[in-house]
Regions:
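Positively charged, helix-rich recognition surfaces that bind polyanionic ligands
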Residues: 2-656
Length: 656
């Protein structure tokens, strides 16, 4: 009997993307602590707790780093530095009474105690902290420390790995294969790129022959022998596995720098050679996070912490036994729970938890859908990520024909440069945000205050001679000793409320600046329901050659997406092609110097977009002038229109 013919299944139709925003299970509202407490004495006690916790956290970070370095140099396995491990470190660095839950991992406790007595305590004659009354606060701190350690590894390991490859494979390539061919530099860059790509895609057989020897020499020191799916994925799921590889890379940088300094100390070399050698010194990174600032940071305070802090001895036990039933009573006794800020939304309920540094406060709210959630129960994660315009269905693209398209080019100088097809523009610059948030003014206040206390500057100048990033065990011990000395001398200076008030003021004014910008979008381009913002997918998370203050990346995109319909556009070639003719453009040079963000197109001379009035066009009569940001915005508008009306991307803006 002949087999039945199988009818091929139709490919699933593109249903597009869901623009409905799912409400987050939690949200926070910022306010000042003094505005919600009933008695100033409460503020005083909370402030003491914040300062005490800050001192514990500073020492905990240094202890963890030293312990991990000790194991690294002994070639022993570094354990997962999770919240459980951090809780044992707290027990090692402090003393408490015998009440409460007993520890289960006695082997780890004994190891940490032995390390503390033999290695850490003698560095500066460390005195153990009194952990009494912190049993409900320390678990939150342990989670925050774990988050900092894992985020450092998750966010930066791949970038650090690529930097290590770029530096040392480059030197190896020059030593082994350098020649006078004109294409040598191009070939070298291609081979190094192929090496990084092969590592990222887990295809080691595709590593170029010229770099296989170098890779095999370093492979076991920069990559694990076993990993899940890929290095990038495994780093996200098992970040602590990559601590020793981070140590190794920093160690190699340090050895390289020592070699450079030995050459500099040679009295026979010229000043020009010294300058050249100094330029080769490599900057080390923080393989494990540290808290170097003495300014007290936010801690989490819940109902149990409040009972521990403020309730009378006879009442504590009874209140702690029935927390949920008593939480409203407890909070109402010490806080102004009748204030409107505690019931701003019908969809969210106050979770009886705050985060504070003694000045500013974040109130934690939970969605009504999880109001009955039991402790430890899982909550479905919310994905409100921004979608690419390429992901839209034909129906959704047809809807965009009725909307005004606004392109937005993210960057370092202009955080967002926005433009529509009518020529309306809106800029949100880094300088504007800095000024409106009072960050610049507040930095000046901090520096003035420091200059009035010259001893602080002298102490910090002395401390700068010791590297916090070193992987050398002895040198890191020296840093811990000097850091402790500096902290003891500057602690009172930084614990002054001025610094926390400045930080609080910066946050509140920054939020005002962002709200003002969001309102300006509507004022410039029309009603929020009538516009669609197509924003470039560049992110300073990947690093930038432009130096300057840290700026918003994905955070600003998410901020815009909260209020407006927002789509991402692949920025490929938008800065390299002329917005008029889609041919190549180049940076304009006058007297050998590039003009900042000024581009020129030799293919077209008629349109003169964004040409500065003070430029003498007779100097470069062969160019049509364009500013980099406006050129990119117009190109992104063209790509968006092409996608909407022709359902594809122009070939000039597609990777070959």
């Amino acid at each position: 009997m002949p087999k039945k013919k199988t009818i091929p299944k139709k490919p699933p139709e593109n249903t597009g993307v869901d623009f409905n925003k799912i409400k987050s299970p939690y949200r926070t509202i910022k306010t000042s602590l003094k505005s919600i407490i009933k008695d100033p004495e409460i503020n005083h006690k909370i402030n003491e707790l914040v300062i005490k916790c800050n001192n514990i956290v500073i020492d905990t970070y240094m202890f963890i780093r030293l312990y991990a370095l000790n194991l690294y140099h002994k070639k022993e396995i570094i354990p997962n530095l999770d919240s459980d491990f951090i809780s044992y470190v707290f027990m090692t660095l402090g003393t408490r009474d015998n009440r409460g839950k007993k520890s289960t991992n006695n082997d780890l406790i004994n190891k940490l105690d032995e390390f503390y007595k033999n290695e850490y305590q003698p560095i500066f004659n460390h005195t153990k902290f009194d952990l009494k009354g912190l049993s409900f606060t320390l678990p939150y701190i342990a989670i925050s420390i774990e988050t900092m350690l894992t985020t450092n590894l998750k966010e930066h390991f791949i970038k650090r790995l690529y930097r290590f490859i770029n530096i040392f494979s480059n030197k190896y390539y020059d030593e082994k294969h350098k020649n006078n061919n004109n294409d040598y530099e191009t070939e070298k860059k291609k081979d190094i790129f192929k090496l990084k790509k092969a590592i990222y895609e887990n295809k080691f057989e595709e590593i170029p022959e010229k770099l296989k020897e170098w890779f095999n020499q370093h492979k076991n020191n920069i990559l694990p022998t076993e990993f899940n799916k890929s290095i990038a994925y495994d780093c996200q799921s098992n970040p602590f596995k990559y601590i020793k590889y981070s140590f190794y890379m920093n160690e190699q940088y340090e050895l390289f720098n020592e070699n450079i300094r030995e050459q500099i100390n040679n009295k026979l070399i010229s000043e020009k050679e010294i300058k050249e050698l100094n330029s080769q010194i490599l900057k080390l990174f923080q393989p494990l996070s540290l808290r170097k600032s003495c300014i007290p940071k936010y801690i989490t305070i819940d109902t149990a912490t409040i009972i521990n802090l403020f309730s009378e001895k006879g009442q504590k036990g009874k209140l702690l036994q029935s927390l949920k039933e008593n939480q409203e009573l407890v909070w109402d006794k010490f806080f102004r729970m009748n204030k409107r800020i505690f019931r701003q939304s019908k969809d969210y309920l106050f979770n009886y938890t705050i985060q504070t540094d003694g000045i500013g406060t974040s109130l934690l709210f939970k969605h009504i859908s999880i109001k009955d959630k039991k402790y430890g129960g899982k909550i479905k994660s919310v994905d409100n990520s921004i979608h690419y315009i390429d992901e839209l269905s034909d129906y959704q693209l047809d809807i965009l024909k009725t909307k005004k398209i606004v392109s937005a080019d993210p960057g370092k100088k202009f955080l967002l440069y926005m433009m529509d097809d009518e020529g309306n523009e809106l800029k949100y610059s880094c300088m504007q945000r800095d000024t409106e948030s009072l960050a610049k003014r507040n930095r000046r206040i901090k520096m003035t205050n420091k200059k009035e206390n010259k001893k602080v500057i002298d102490i910090e100048t002395e401390l700068s001679n010791y590297l916090s990033t070193t992987v050398n065990y002895i040198k890191f011990k020296e840093f811990i000793r000097e850091k402790h000395k500096a902290n003891e001398k500057t602690k009172l200076f930084y614990e002054n409320e001025l610094y926390r008030k400045i930080n609080w003021r910066t946050k509140t004014y920054r939020q005002r600046s962002e709200d003002k910008f969001l309102n300006n979008i509507e004022n410039n381009f029309g009603e929020k329901n009538d516009i669609v913002i197509c924003i470039g997918d560049w992110s300073n998370k990947q690093g930038s050659c432009i130096k300057g203050a840290s700026t918003m990346g994905i955070g600003l995109k998410r901020l815009v997406a909260k209020k407006y319909t927002t789509l991402l556009i692949d920025e490929y070639n938008t800065s390299k092609k002329c917005c008029n003719c889609w041919q190549d453009i180049e940076n304009v040079k006058i007297n050998g110097n590039s003009k900042f963000r000024l581009l020129g197109c030799k293919n077209c001379k008629i349109n003169n977009i964004g040409s500065p009035e003070d430029e003498k066009k007779s100097i470069l009569q062969s160019y049509s002038f364009l500013t980099r940001d406006k050129n990119s915005c117009i190109n992104m508008l063209s790509i968006a229109k092409h996608m909407i009306y022709k359902r594809n991307r122009p070939k000039e803006f597609m990777p070959s």
